[in-house]
Curated annotation (Swiss-Prot):
GO cellular component: cytoplasm; ribonucleoprotein complex; ribosome
Gene Ontology biological process terms in this record: translation
Gene Ontology molecular-function annotations: structural constituent of ribosome
Name of the featured protein: Large ribosomal subunit protein bL36
Organism: Hahella chejuensis (strain KCTC 2396)
Record keyword Lipid biosynthesis present: no
Annotated keywords: Ribonucleoprotein, Ribosomal protein
Length: 38
């Protein structure tokens, strides 16, 4: 999980979601693409 100021989609499998007020990226194809804004 990377914590970044701005989260971006890195590939086709990435999806931007909101959990508990935080913007996150989850990826089905590449788990290393997981990101959290903060």
């Amino acid at each position: 999980m990377k914590v970044r100021a701005s989260v971006k989609k890195m590939c086709r499998g990435c999806k931007i979601i909101r959990r508990n007020g935080a913007v996150m990226v989850i990826c089905s194809t590449e788990p290393r693409h997981k990101q959290k804004q903060g």
